[in-house]
């Protein structure tokens, strides 16, 4: 979609709002401990948490970080988040892929579960597709993917699982690292509030 087709209003988030994720020192320490195989793709919603993660990673590994935005179209502000992602990535010279998906859920499936499954499948597909050359240099294949979930997200997920009567497996904590579809996946902000 051409940028001109997007709405000109932005959701109430900006790179400055990324300070809500954690203090700069805590974020910096988390990124210093984070050592993914490069190149790295960041799942980029355009919200404060993923903006903080993307900018910190792009600063630490210039030219080795790309962003993937999955547009579910489930929120009225979805197109505005696309615009936020486009602007942020352009300002920081981070390659961006915008993936539009149909997040309708199947009968008996929760909308959240359908959106999550589709989002993960889309992230895998986008990460594995070729990326445009940067400055005439071909971009190597993405080797790892980072998600901006943090401790508050983990608590929210646990409470949601409890409210749905989840068993022991459903109450397990979010992993900070795992492998899936040939990619190393990370949640480097999981220890941050």
Label every PLM stretch briefly.
Residues 2-193:
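Core alpha/beta nucleotide-donor-binding catalytic domains of modification enzymes
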């Amino acid at each position: 979609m051409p940028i001109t087709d997007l709405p000109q209003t932005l959701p109430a988030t900006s790179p400055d709002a990324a300070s809500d994720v954690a203090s700069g020192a805590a974020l910096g320490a988390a990124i210093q401990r984070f050592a993914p195989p490069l190149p790295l793709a960041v799942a980029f919603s355009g919200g404060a948490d993923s903006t903080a993660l993307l900018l910190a990673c792009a600063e630490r590994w210039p030219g080795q970080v790309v962003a993937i935005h999955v547009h579910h179209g489930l929120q009225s502000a979805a197109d505005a988040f696309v615009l936020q992602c486009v602007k942020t990535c352009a300002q920081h010279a981070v390659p961006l892929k915008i993936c539009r998906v149909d997040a309708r859920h199947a009968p008996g499936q929760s909308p959240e579960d359908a959106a999550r499954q589709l989002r993960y499948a889309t992230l895998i597909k986008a990460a594995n597709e070729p990326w445009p050359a940067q400055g005439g240099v071909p971009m190597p294949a993405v080797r790892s993917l980072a998600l901006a979930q943090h401790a508050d997200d983990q608590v929210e997920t646990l409470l949601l699982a409890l409210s749905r009567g989840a068993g022991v497996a459903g109450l397990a904590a979010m992993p900070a690292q795992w492998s899936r579809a040939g990619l190393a996946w990370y949640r480097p902000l999981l220890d941050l509030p």
